[in-house]
């Protein structure tokens, strides 16, 4: 299931996934910061598919409400379901800013650092039920937002990245796919993975 934040009353025409090209997807409009909405979303997913194997929390914009509260509520609701079958994987998307900070982004850095701390605790709590919890911290990823940056700002940003370029959405998706689905990731939990071109070196 794909849950996306959209203006009220609107829904995307389609869901594009760089990870699983032929997978079935359902679109759900939900307020991640409202516990009742999250619980209803999880119930709908279980009713439709029968279980929840993996969740990847990747919501943002409203800094604390979505970046931290939303991650907590979605992880909590999914864990209750995963505990019954003693298996599951949770991948929370934070940011390299949550590790190293950034001028003018105190609230964002605090929220993302909170996601990292929460995930480590959730990993300890879920381990006895075979629930893996990990964090992915992207750096600057090519997006509509970076496309709007001026030439001077882009040059300044690229100067902070040892690899000298933006990451691509597929870079992040590939790491999330590995953590979510690969048998080789079954012994990985409580870890924070940077995918940032070397910013946090």
Curated annotation (Swiss-Prot):
Q: Which GO terms describe its molecular function?
A: 3-oxoacyl-[acyl-carrier-protein] reductase (NADPH) activity
**Tissue expression from the record:** Embryo and leaf tissues.
GO BP terms: namely: fatty acid biosynthetic process
- Superkingdom of the source species: Eukaryota
User: Which keywords, in A-to-Z order, does the entry hold?
Assistant: Chloroplast, Fatty acid biosynthesis, Fatty acid metabolism, Lipid biosynthesis, Lipid metabolism, NADP, Oxidoreductase, Plastid
Active-site residues annotated for this sequence: 108
| Enzyme class per UniProt | oxidoreductase
Q: Where is this protein primarily located?
A: plastid
Signal peptide boundaries:
none
Task: Give the metabolic or biological pathway.
Answer: Lipid metabolism; fatty acid biosynthesis
Record InterPro entries = NAD(P)-bd_dom_sf, Sc_DH/Rdtase_CS, SDR, SDR_fam
Kindly give the Pfam families that the UniProt entry links to this protein.
adh_short_C2
Does 4Fe-4S appear among the keywords?
no
Gene3D superfamilies per UniProt = NAD(P)-binding Rossmann-like Domain (3.40.50.720)
Record bears the keyword Plastid = yes
* Enzyme Commission identifier(s): 1.1.1.100
Q: Which residues bind substrate?
A: 95
**Reactions catalysed according to its record:** a (3R)-hydroxyacyl-[ACP] + NADP(+) = a 3-oxoacyl-[ACP] + NADPH + H(+)
Could you tell me where this protein is found in the cell?
Plastid, Chloroplast
Residues crossing the lipid bilayer are none
Further information: Exhibits a marked preference for acyl-carrier protein derivatives over CoA derivatives as substrates.
Q: Which family does it belong to?
A: Belongs to the short-chain dehydrogenases/reductases (SDR) family.
Checking PANTHER family in the record gives: 3-OXOACYL-(ACYL-CARRIER-PROTEIN) REDUCTASE, 3-OXOACYL-[ACYL-CARRIER-PROTEIN] REDUCTASE FABG
Protein name in the entry: 3-oxoacyl-[acyl-carrier-protein] reductase
What species is given as this protein's source? Answer: Brassica napus (Rape)
């Amino acid at each position: 299931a794909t849950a996306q934040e959209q203006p009220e009353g609107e829904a995307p025409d389609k869901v594009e996934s760089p990870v699983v090209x032929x997978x079935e997807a359902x679109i759900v409009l939900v307020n991640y910061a409202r516990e009742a909405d999250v619980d209803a979303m999880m119930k709908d997913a279980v009713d439709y598919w029968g279980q929840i194997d993996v969740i990847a929390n990747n919501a943002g914009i409203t800094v604390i409400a979505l970046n931290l509260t939303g991650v907590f509520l979605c992880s909590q609701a999914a864990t209750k379901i995963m505990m019954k079958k003693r298996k599951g994987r949770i991948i929370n998307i934070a940011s390299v800013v949550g590790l190293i900070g950034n001028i003018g982004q105190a609230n964002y850095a605090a929220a993302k650092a909170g996601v990292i701390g929460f995930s480590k605790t959730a990993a300890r709590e879920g381990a006895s039920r075979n629930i893996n919890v990990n964090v992915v911290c992207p750096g600057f990823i090519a997006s509509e937002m970076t496309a709007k940056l001026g030439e001077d700002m882009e040059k300044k940003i690229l100067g902070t990245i040892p690899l000298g370029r933006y990451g691509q959405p597929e870079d992040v998706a590939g790491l999330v796919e590995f953590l979510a689905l690969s048998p080789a990731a079954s012994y990985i939990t409580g870890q924070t993975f940077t995918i940032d071109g070397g910013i946090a070196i």
